[in-house]
Amino acid sequence: MLEIKGLTKKFGSKTVINDFSMTVADNEIMAIVGPSGAGKTTLLRCITGLERVNAGAFYWNGKQFDPVNPDKNDTIIGVVFQDYQLFPNLTVMGNITLAPTLVKKLGADEVEKTATALLERLGLGGKENLYPYQLSGGQKQRVAIVRALAMNPKILCYDEPTSALDPALRDEVAQIILDLKKQKMTQIVVTHDMDFAKNVADEIQQVEQIQ
């Protein structure tokens, strides 16, 4: 279970998130929704350690942790970015195996075996040697999901996973998220799309812009 207690984030004198608390149960899909400018992406960046908080604490199963300084051997949070952030000079396999080998110091054979299994699971078998420019938008997103899963996180977070996707791809993303839930993956989805949130989420947390 993930617990966030009293999270506050400021940029200079502007408070973007004020005393925010949230609990995400194991194997649950939590959607964070709200209008543009309400701080959804900033909240996700705090949860994933890309932004330092001004106040607040994070707990995983009752044990406090710091997303900014994670334990390299025990990944709690994984993230799929809105723009995927794949390395254009690396193949699909290279994108997926880079972090596990560099950060977790896992052996190349072990990492490639895991990556191959994940690619098959998400319908990307045979794409290992392609480069990002050779992939469709939906395929790039699935590679980004596989890359996050390869670090074996406890929780997988998504930043606006349906932005700029047509209805068919939105349904595909929803199915991937629901399939991962069946495999006991806890997930947090940041989205402006309430219909999508209702389709996938067990619980919806609404955030409003601070006046």
Model-based region annotation:
Residues 131-135, 139:
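Conserved ABC ATPase signature
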